[in-house]
Amino acid sequence: MKLESSAELSQTTAPGEVFLGAVSDFTSAVPMEVATNPAIAFSTVNQGKLTFNAPPEVVARYFDDHQGWFARCAAPMQVQPMGQNGYTLVIGRFGSFGYEVEPKVGLEMKSHLPGMYTIESIPLPEDGELGYEVDFRSTMQLVEGHNNTVTYAEWKLDLKANVRFPQFIYTLPKGLIQKTGDRLLNQIVKQVSHRLNQKVVDDFHQNYSTQ
């Protein structure tokens, strides 16, 4: 796996590598050949925990104010607001077997109960032209730690992606495509979530924990 800055995105990457970074613009529509090919389903489930040195009510105010930090913490991924609680997020580039894609996804963050949040995928206007569909479902719960001075944000992500490939990909063994796609999806989620989680924790302690 390879993480790249926006300046490195034009470099050649060997087949089978994953590469992520900032992109100059949102993904354009895929060729008609790809859009009409049968989709292959990939999935991954991940979970983790963030630690904040503050009481739950302070951490909750931070997450409720996600318009103030989400885009900043998601960088170098490209973010555009969608309504009050939604965002269009361009993840970067990734690929395998010589095929590359720059995916974007619509996400909406909501608080249903105090200290409980969901992030779910929402439709994009051009969904039917992208060559893939993403089903993103994440839950997060704030848990009070020792003496009300520490808060844990426990999260779980269930991610499914249906991807349409160029015709030459379908000549490969189906089991190889499935195994490689699931593995790459899992690696991408782990890499992105690790970076985003760390940046959120750092951002909170630098800008919000004393409020």
Map each language-model feature to its residues.
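A conserved amphipathic terminal alpha-helix motif
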Residues: 170-211
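Beta-strand/loop substructures that line and gate deep hydrophobic ligand-binding cavities in soluble
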Residues: 128-182
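Hydrophobic-ligand binding "helix-grip"
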Residues: 2-4, 100-152
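Solvent-exposed residues in well-ordered beta-strands and their adjoining turns
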Residues: 51-55, 92-94, 110-112, 141-143, ...
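Short, intrinsically disordered, mixed-charge
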Residues: 61-68, 75, 112, 190, ...
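Generic short beta-strand segments
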Residues: 86-94, 120-124, 159-160
